[in-house]
Amino acid sequence: MEITDIGGVLCNGIKEGKYGLGLVRVRGSIAGVFTQNKIRAAPVIVCEENIRDGVVEGVIVNSGNANAYTGEQGMRDAREMCRIAANLLGCEERRVAVASTGVIGRKLDMEWIRKKAPEVYSGLGNSVENAERFGRAIVTTDRFVKKAYSEKARIAAVAKGAGMIAPNMATMLCFAFTSAKFDSGELYDMLRRAADKTFNRLTVDGDTSTNDTVLLISTGKERVERDVFEEELCSVFYSIAKQMARDGEGATKVFEVRVDGARNDEDANLIARAVASSLLVKTAIFGCDPNWGRIIAAAGYSGADVDERITLSLSDGRDEVFLIDSGRPLGNEERARVLMEKAEELVIRLRLEKGNGKGFAIGCDLTYDYVKLNAEYTT
């Protein structure tokens, strides 16, 4: 199921080298959540302004240039992107959502965007190929486009994101479309909760982008129960978050940190995020080194209420190796190493003896290729 399987969604895109441009025609209700970085890209500011009344008729996206830290010129360029799309789509400028991703601090090549936008518009359609072209247009260092859907709730989403990913949200753009009928206020409430339970639990490298944008758009053609929709939206976002971790720049392994028995959920999530964000843990995962001391240390500095009564295990989804039992090391490092070498996905499970709090985070290993990719990013 592609985004073009949602009735009323037409899209297209073009990719030339590092630069891409995507366009969507869609009329409906819209909600968005955006970066928590204090340095906010121009398209984030403009997009927030434009979707404030909850109505959308189009989306325009460019990749290769973030249009961030570009001052007043950046704001003018973001608004011009909306104006270009509006003129093509035959709608008001304020009905266009805009997003950008790429290198920070460089001016947009507006001449290229002006030239390519009519070409993209002329190819708008609802085919699988249209959806694929839009997906390719929005990626940067991604190895693949992230996609997920729910037939049950009539949701389809497409996203990009591979590096500069850390709570809150991750460098990510995500565009989710649904034919389920909800107003913008309902969409926002469900979007905010779903993003918090998924994207805000994801960390690749500890950096938070200036451009994070997640948009949820409803064409309002079908009735879906709200509880069902929100549960399915979480599932769609969880799938995309896992794909982002799998595609973390240079990543070879994805892992989840699951915590229970914490004093409360807040503490559990603090611990999970600290472990998932730890560079020492990430490099240990890459090296298949069951150095559980790094995990314990991260739990200890997380800010949560922690003591030595921790039970720690590693699992590949089939087999589980316990390394610590209620504070007592078990000497199972070699068994854990063998499990890590075979696994593509791991679960690090920490059980505390503080209460009933539960939490989780998603991460990936940190490899030599991550350094190489990011050392050469702007060259």
UniProtKB/Swiss-Prot annotation:
Name the residues annotated as site: Cleavage: A170, T171
Gene label: argJ
The UniProt entry's coiled-coil ranges are: none
Q: Which reaction does it catalyse?
A: N(2)-acetyl-L-ornithine + L-glutamate = N-acetyl-L-glutamate + L-ornithine; L-glutamate + acetyl-CoA = N-acetyl-L-glutamate + CoA + H(+)
In terms of Pfam families, this protein maps to: ArgJ
In short, the EC number is 2.3.1.35, 2.3.1.1
Q: What is this protein called?
A: Arginine biosynthesis bifunctional protein ArgJ
Which residues are noted in the entry as substrate-binding? T140, K160, T171, E249, N374, T379
InterPro entries attached here?
Arg_biosynth_ArgJ (IPR002813), ArgJ-like_dom_sf (IPR016117), ArgJ_beta_C (IPR042195)
- Top EC group: transferase
GO biological process annotation, one example: L-arginine biosynthetic process
Q: Which UniProt keywords apply?
A: Acyltransferase, Amino-acid biosynthesis, Arginine biosynthesis, Autocatalytic cleavage, Cytoplasm, Multifunctional enzyme, Transferase
Q: Where is this site: Involved in the stabilization of negative charge on the oxyanion by the formation of the oxyanion hole?
A: T101, G102
Q: Name one GO cellular component term.
A: cytoplasm
Q: Which organism is it from?
A: Archaeoglobus fulgidus (strain ATCC 49558 / DSM 4304 / JCM 9628 / NBRC 100126 / VC-16)
Q: Where in the cell is it found?
A: Cytoplasm
Where primarily located?
A: cytoplasm
Q: Tell me, in a sentence or two, what this protein's role is.
A: Catalyzes two activities which are involved in the cyclic version of arginine biosynthesis: the synthesis of N-acetylglutamate from glutamate and acetyl-CoA as the acetyl donor, and of ornithine by transacetylation between N(2)-acetylornithine and glutamate.
User: Tell me, how does this one assemble?
Assistant: Heterotetramer of two alpha and two beta chains.
- Annotated family: Belongs to the ArgJ family.
Its UniProt pathway annotation is: Amino-acid biosynthesis; L-arginine biosynthesis; L-ornithine and N-acetyl-L-glutamate from L-glutamate and N(2)-acetyl-L-ornithine (cyclic): step 1/1; Amino-acid biosynthesis; L-arginine biosynthesis; N(2)-acetyl-L-ornithine from L-glutamate: step 1/4
Q: Which domain of life is it from?
A: Archaea
Location of the active site: T171 (nucleophile)
GO molecular function term, any single one: L-glutamate N-acetyltransferase activity
